[in-house]
């Protein structure tokens, strides 16, 4: 709708004028009287004017405006043809046919450039302007159509026919349409803030559909083509429907516009208020004589900091560019704050600061030995790096990944490495990180943008070559925000990280001097490209002796001090410490052991606080009083195994375990039942073992008819604990043979290895942990695959002295070792070297001993004593 700027006038706001190009405008619409009033008073005059309209009229082309009946409008006439048309009209009845131009840019419109339907107007006033233009005031009289043009020069003239206005009968449908149009008009007026009682009275006072349509169309903002369509519609109801459609569209536009203006006004009001307050503050400072030169001081301070930073030339070029931008900004603008923060980051980064490496190899070894017990491989790798660094100062830093179970000291090892090298230490926890921007940073276009964690760590360290530990790298996630592991590819690539670009800085930063250390529990979850960039060093679990030594040197003194005690107040016997480790913790690391020692110290601290005098000596008997009943009970070592029983070895995240496998036979039809919550791989190992036995039944002393006459049941105790992996293959085979031929398996021997259908024994993992478990159980012999002899280097020599290791290629070599009464010589012990070369011949001899003169019937299930309840083992993955 048009704007109503006064309560007494209904105004038309149609924009530029009717005639020629620039400078041609409508007169101020305030000169136009209320159309409703004019129509009421001059209705008879207009009727007379309509009757006196001649058949031939001068034509006045107008731009960007359509005139409707009863509409009063001032026009400025500038084109010579138009001026002559007006003068001709004044000489003969003061009538003109006003037609809209099809194209506003047309300077000399001809008959084909104007619409054929226009409005006959009566010239009410004329005024000649000093610049040769003419101003006229016209009022619409009647619609008319051009029949034919009678002349083109010196102005357009045409024969016309007027279009009569029908008066429809006002019924319920017409009344509903009238109300709808009025309501839509009121909404538009209200949204534009122009509603007034007088204007609403004008709308309510017009009951004729055609006249109401013309009145509203004359005061509505719409395109010329839409207005022309309304003008050319002869039926009043159809015309009113078109107006109603335009009003609905205008309501939608006005609603959105009002919302936008409200939002903009609120923001403008706040900005004006802030500006006003700042100006007042400046005036107050000026009155106080406090000159505002803080901005210049800040720029000089930033420039000095950038000079001191020692950044590369290309980075300094970008910094100077941003500094010039900042100088041209208002100090309190939001953009200035962004640029200022960016320059602060550039100035505070260690572009040239390097920590001097401590290249004393002996001193570094001493520090590593003080902080960590064992971990010889990792210590050797760090010392190798120091040696290379000493010989070649320009060498790049290694990217190591420490992989192992929780609590074995992966993260603390990074701190020890930094201390040994004399470098600063930073740790980044990557567990649960899903956003790539955490690594690369956010772009400065975002509100609250910051650099990534890598750049932040370098700023905190203050040097360009710290030791940065990327903790829990295997627990990185990925979602719609990106993949942080992909962002780490550049960070951890020595060929690329010398030009690492953070999204926030948007300039290269050299990371090649940084020593990155990653930690992980499981390598399988690390993406292959990322794992390929790291040198993986596996940290095995601690042995009993290592745990006891660490507890004596580090954990116990630490907990005594934390709980307000002194070392002289607490004495923990070796046997008591071993009991705590064996019966209250079951882990590869030390966290639970640390908690149990802390619990002991707290209880002793309470005794001291209650007045009891120390020192307090903790013996084996005192452990249960302080910590309660043991949480883990070691399985009793069997003096004799019943037929069908064999001892295997399993690897768990908490270390190695001795696994008992039981097999029994019963009358049936050759079925095989497997229980003990076994995984698919372990079930397949049992099937392979059974197939191997069936293929060599007679050689193994087993009656071949067992396939059709007996059922076999294999069970692995601790049924609540899931078990899987291929390394129980030889154990399952041995238990099945024992159950089928009735021979007992030696109770002091355990075994591990994958079995094939040909009887070959394949290598498995976790050899160190498995041998440690066998030693802890007190077993004397262990059978391993021959290809695992290389892993014996990781087993402490003192442990190899307590158990004999028997490497085997084929299951035939295992037979003379496992059954009671057979020779157990030819193993590996001491330093872990292979036994005499006669191992194979002995195995062959043993094989002859095992083969019976005739195959034995499957042994009847033996009656055995009731075993003690076995504790559940942690999840055993026999394959490793």
UniProtKB/Swiss-Prot annotation:
Keywords of this entry: ATP-binding, Cytoplasm, Hydrolase, Nucleotide-binding, Protease, Serine protease, Stress response
Protein name in UniProt: Lon protease
Compositionally biased region (Basic and acidic residues): 27-37
Chief place where the protein resides: cytoplasm
Residues of the Lon N-terminal domain: 57-251
Record-listed ATP binding positions: 404-411
Originating organism: Desulfovibrio desulfuricans (strain ATCC 27774 / DSM 6949 / MB)
Positions of the Lon proteolytic domain: 640-821
NCBIfam families reported for this sequence: lon
InterPro entries, A to Z: AAA+_ATPase, ATPase_AAA_core, Lon_bac, Lon_bac/euk-typ, Lon_lid, Lon_proteolytic, Lon_Prtase, Lon_prtase_N
Family the entry assigns: Belongs to the peptidase S16 family.
GO CC, any one term: cytoplasm
Catalytic activity from the UniProt record: Hydrolysis of proteins in presence of ATP
Gene3D superfamilies (UniProt xref): 1.10.8.60, 1.20.5.5270, 1.20.58.1480, 3.30.230.10, LON domain-like, P-loop containing nucleotide triphosphate hydrolases
One function term, GO molecular function aspect: sequence-specific DNA binding
GO biological process, one term: cellular response to heat
Annotated catalytic residues: 727, 770
Known function: ATP-dependent serine protease that mediates the selective degradation of mutant and abnormal proteins as well as certain short-lived regulatory proteins. Required for cellular homeostasis and for survival from DNA damage and developmental changes induced by stress. Degrades polypeptides processively to yield small peptide fragments that are 5 to 10 amino acids long. Binds to DNA in a double-stranded, site-specific manner.
The enzyme's E.C. designation: 3.4.21.53
SUPFAM superfamilies documented for this protein: P-loop containing nucleoside triphosphate hydrolases, PUA domain-like, Ribosomal protein S5 domain 2-like
UniProt biased composition (Low complexity): 852-861
């Amino acid at each position: 709708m048009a704007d109503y700027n006064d309560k007494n006038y209904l105004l038309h706001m149609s924009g530029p004028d009717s005639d020629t190009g620039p400078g041609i405008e409508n007169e101020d619409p305030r000169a136009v009287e209320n159309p409703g009033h004019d129509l009421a008073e001059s209705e008879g005059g207009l009727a007379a004017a309509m009757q006196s309209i001649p058949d031939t009229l001068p034509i006045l082309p107008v731009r960007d405006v359509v005139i409707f009946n009863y509409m009063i409008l001032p026009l400025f006439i500038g084109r010579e043809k138009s001026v002559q048309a007006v003068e001709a009209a004044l000489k003969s009845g003061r009538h003109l046919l006003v037609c809209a131009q099809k194209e506003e840019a047309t300077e000399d419109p001809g008959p084909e450039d104007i619409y054929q339907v226009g409005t006959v107007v009566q010239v009410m006033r004329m005024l000649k302007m000093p610049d040769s233009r003419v101003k006229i005031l016209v009022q619409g009289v009647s619609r008319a159509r051009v029949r034919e043009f009678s002349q083109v020069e010196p102005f357009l003239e045409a024969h016309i026919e007027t279009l009569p206005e029908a008066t429809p009968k006002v019924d319920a449908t017409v009344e509903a349409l009238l109300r709808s149009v009025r309501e839509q008009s009121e909404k538009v007026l209200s949204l534009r803030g122009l509603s007034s009682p007088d204007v609403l009275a004008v709308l309510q006072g017009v009951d004729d559909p055609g006249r109401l349509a013309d009145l509203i169309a004359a005061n509505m903002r719409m395109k010329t083509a839409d207005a022309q369509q309304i003008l050319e519609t002869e039926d009043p109801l159809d015309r009113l429907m078109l107006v109603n459609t335009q009003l609905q569209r205008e309501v939608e536009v006005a609603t959105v516009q009002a919302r936008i203006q409200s939002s903009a006004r609120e923001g403008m009001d706040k900005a004006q208020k802030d500006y006003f307050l700042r100006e007042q503050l400046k005036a107050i400072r000026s009155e106080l004589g406090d000159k505002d030169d803080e901005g210049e001081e800040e720029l000089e301070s930033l420039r000095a900091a950038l000079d001191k930073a020692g950044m590369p030339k290309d980075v300094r070029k970008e910094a100077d560019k941003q500094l010039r931008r900042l100088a041209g900004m208002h100090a309190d603008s939001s953009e200035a704050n962004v640029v200022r923060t960016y320059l602060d980051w550039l100035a505070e980064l260690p572009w040239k600061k390097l920590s001097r490496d401590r290249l004393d190899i002996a001193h570094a070894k001493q520090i590593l030995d003080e902080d960590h017990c064992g971990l010889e491989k990792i210590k050797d790798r760090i010392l190798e790096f120091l040696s290379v660094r000493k010989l070649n100062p320009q060498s790049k830093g290694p990217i190591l990944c420490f992989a192992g179970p929780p609590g074995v000291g992966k993260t603390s090892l990074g701190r020890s490495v930094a201390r040994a090298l004399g470098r600063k230490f930073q740790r980044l926890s990557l567990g649960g990180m899903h956003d790539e921007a955490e690594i690369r940073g956010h772009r400065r276009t975002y509100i609250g943008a910051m650099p990534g964690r890598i750049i932040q760590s370098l700023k905190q360290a203050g040097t360009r070559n710290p030791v940065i530990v990327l903790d829990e790298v295997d627990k990185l996630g990925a979602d719609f925000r990106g993949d942080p592991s992909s962002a780490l590819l550049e960070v951890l690539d020595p060929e690329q990280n010398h030009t690492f670009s953070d999204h926030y800085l948007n300039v290269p930063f050299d990371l090649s001097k940084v020593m990155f250390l990653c930690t992980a529990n499981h390598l399988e979850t690390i993406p292959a490209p990322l794992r390929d960039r790291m040198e993986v060093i596996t940290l095995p679990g601690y042995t009993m002796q290592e745990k006891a030594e660490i507890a004596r040197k580090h954990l116990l003194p630490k907990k005594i001090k934390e709980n307000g005690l002194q070392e002289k107040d607490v004495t923990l016997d070796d046997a008591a410490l071993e009991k705590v480790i064996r019966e209250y913790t079951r882990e590869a690391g030390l966290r639970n052991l640390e908690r149990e020692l802390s619990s002991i110290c707290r209880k002793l601290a309470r005794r001291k606080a209650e007045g009891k005098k120390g020192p307090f000596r903790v013996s084996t008997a005192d452990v249960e009083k302080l910590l309660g009943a043991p949480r883990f009970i070691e399985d009793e070592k069997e003096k004799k195994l019943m037929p069908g029983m064999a001892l295997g070895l399993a690897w768990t995240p908490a270390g190695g375990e001795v696994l008992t496998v039981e097999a029994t036979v019963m009358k049936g039809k050759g079925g095989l039942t497997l229980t003990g919550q076994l995984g698919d791989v372990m079930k397949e190992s049992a099937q392979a073992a059974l197939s191997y036995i069936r293929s060599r039944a007679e050689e193994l002393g087993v009656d071949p008819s067992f396939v059709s006459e007996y059922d076999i049941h294999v069970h692995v105790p601790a049924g609540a604990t899931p078990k899987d992996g291929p390394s129980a293959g030889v154990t399952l085979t041995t238990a099945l043979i024992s159950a089928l031929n009735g021979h007992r398996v030696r109770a002091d021997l355990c075994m591990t290895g994958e079995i094939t259908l040909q009887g070959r024994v394949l290598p498995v993992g976790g050899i160190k942990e498995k041998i440690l478990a066998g030693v802890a159980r007190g077993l004397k012999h262990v059978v391993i695959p021959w290809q695992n002899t290389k892993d014996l280097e990781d087993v402490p020599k003192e442990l190899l002295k307590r158990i004999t290791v028997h490497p085997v290629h084929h299951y035939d070599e295992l037979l003379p070792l496992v059954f009671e009464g057979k020779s157990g010589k030819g193993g590996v012990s001491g330093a872990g070297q292979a036994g005499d070369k006669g191992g194979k011949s002995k195995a062959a001899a043993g094989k002859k001993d095992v083969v019976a003169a005739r195959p034995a019937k499957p042994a009847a299930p033996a009656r055995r004593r009731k075993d003690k309840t076995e504790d559940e083992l942690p999840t055993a993955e026999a394959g490793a």
